[in-house]
Amino acid sequence: MVSHSGLLTVMERAARKAGSKLRRDFGEVEHLQVSRKGPADFVSKADKQCEKTLVEELQKARPDWGFLLEEGGVIEGDPTKPRWIIDPLDGTTNFLHGIPHFAISIAVEEPLYGGKRDITTGLVYQPVSDESYWAEKSRGAWRHDQRLRVSARRDMGECLIATGIPFMGH
C-alpha cells in the first residue's frame, strides 16, 4: 500500500466529506436549484454546498492558506503559504443530466521566489465510484494505490482519446 502524505490525507478526507453530499444530491438532481453563470455554464446549489464544505474542512487543517475557488473567487491567505485551488463539481453538466461522471478537484499551489507559483499536489475524487486519483510532484500519478503510467504508443491511430464538451447553446 502506498502511503499518502499528510497533505493528501487532508485533501482526501475533505473530498470524501463533500462527496457524500454530492452523492445525495445526485440522487435528487431533478429537485436542485440551477442558475446560469454564462453560456452552457451551470451552477447548482450542490456546487456551492460542496465548495463550502471543502473550504471549511481545508481551513481546519491549514487555517493560514488561501483559496482560489471556481464558485467563490479568491479567499486571501498568508502569501508566503500555499493556497488551495478547488473545483467543487467538475462535470456540472453531467451531474445535472444524471450522468455519473463528475468529480471534486483539489490542487495545492506553492509560492515560489519572485511571485511565481507551482502546483505540487492534486487530487480528483469521483464520489459515485468512490475513486481517487492523485499526484504529487516527484511521486508520480496514482489511482488509489496503483501507479499510473504514460502509454508508450506514438501513433495516434492506436490511441484511445476521449473528451467532454458541454453543449454550447447560442
Enumerate the predicted regions with their spans.
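N-terminal subdomain of lithium-sensitive/metallo-dependent phosphomonoesterases centered on the IMPase/IPPase/PAP
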Residues: M1-L89
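Residue-level signal for inorganic ion chemistry
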Residues: L22, D47, L58, T92, ...
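Short coil/turn motifs at beta-sheet boundaries
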Residues: G77, H97-I99, R154-M156
